[in-house]
Amino acid sequence: MGMRMMFTMLLLVVLATTVVSFTLDHAFDGRNTAANNKATDLMALPVRGCCSDPPCRHKHQDLCG
């Protein structure tokens, strides 16, 4: 192979690596968002139970409003 062909191959490898890395990064962001939403929902369940209990609601007025 000539130098020009080897340089072209190097550029193609770098471009392909960048595209794959960029795509995977966005996929992980989506998974993290879904996991964070699920965790938030799970944490909200005990708070809702607390807000329906008058002594607990009084103790945690900042959470129950």
Curated annotation (Swiss-Prot):
Where found in the cell? Secreted
* Tissue and organ expression note: Expressed by the venom duct.
Its UniProt domain note says: The cysteine framework is I (CC-C-C). Alpha4/7 pattern.
Annotated region (Ser-Xaa-Pro motif, crucial for potent interaction with nAChR), positions in chain:
52-54
Primary location: secreted
Query: How is this chain modified after translation?
Result: Possibly amidated at Cys-64.
The signal peptide, as residue positions, is 1-21
Propeptide positions, renumbered to this chain? 22-48
| Stated name of the protein | Alpha-conotoxin-like Lv1.4
Similarity annotation: Belongs to the conotoxin A superfamily.
Keyword check for Disulfide bond: yes
- InterPro entries (UniProt xref): Conotoxin_a-typ, Conotoxin_a-typ_CS
A molecular function GO annotation: acetylcholine receptor inhibitor activity
> Which lineage is the organism of this entry classified under, starting from the top rank?
Eukaryota, Metazoa, Spiralia, Lophotrochozoa, Mollusca
What keywords would UniProt list here?
Acetylcholine receptor inhibiting toxin, Amidation, Disulfide bond, Neurotoxin, Postsynaptic neurotoxin, Secreted, Signal, Toxin
Q: What does this protein do?
A: Alpha-conotoxins act on postsynaptic membranes, they bind to the nicotinic acetylcholine receptors (nAChR) and thus inhibit them. At high doses (10 uM), the synthetic non-amidated toxin (residues 49-65) completely inhibits frog sciatic nerve-gastrocnemius muscle contractility. It also inhibit the cholinergic miniature excitatory postsynaptic currents (mEPSCs) frequency and amplitude of projection neurons in insects (D.melanogaster). In vivo, the toxin (100 ug/kg) shows good analgesic effects in mouse hot plate model and formalin test.
Q: Name one GO cellular component term.
A: extracellular region
Which organism does this record belong to?
Answer: Conus lividus
> Could you tell me which cysteines form disulfide bridges?
C50-C56, C51-C64
